[in-house]
Amino acid sequence: MSLDDLIAMCRAKLAHLSQLRPSAVSLGDTEQVERIDAEAIKTQQTLNQLLTLA
C-alpha cells in the first residue's frame, strides 16, 4: 500500500465520520458522538503525519 493510498483512506474515513456525526447528534446519542469525535481526531492526526511524509 502506497503513502497516497493511506492518505486517501484517511480522507475517506474522515468524510464517512463527518456523515455519521449529524445522525448521532440528532438522535441525542452523546456516547456515539464522543466515539465519532475521538476517531476523527485520531484519523486527522494520522493524516497530518502522513502528509508530512508526502
Regions found by a protein language model. Name each.
Residues 2-20, 36-40:
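Short amphipathic alpha-helical heptad-repeat segments
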Residues 22-34:
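Charged, low-complexity interaction regions
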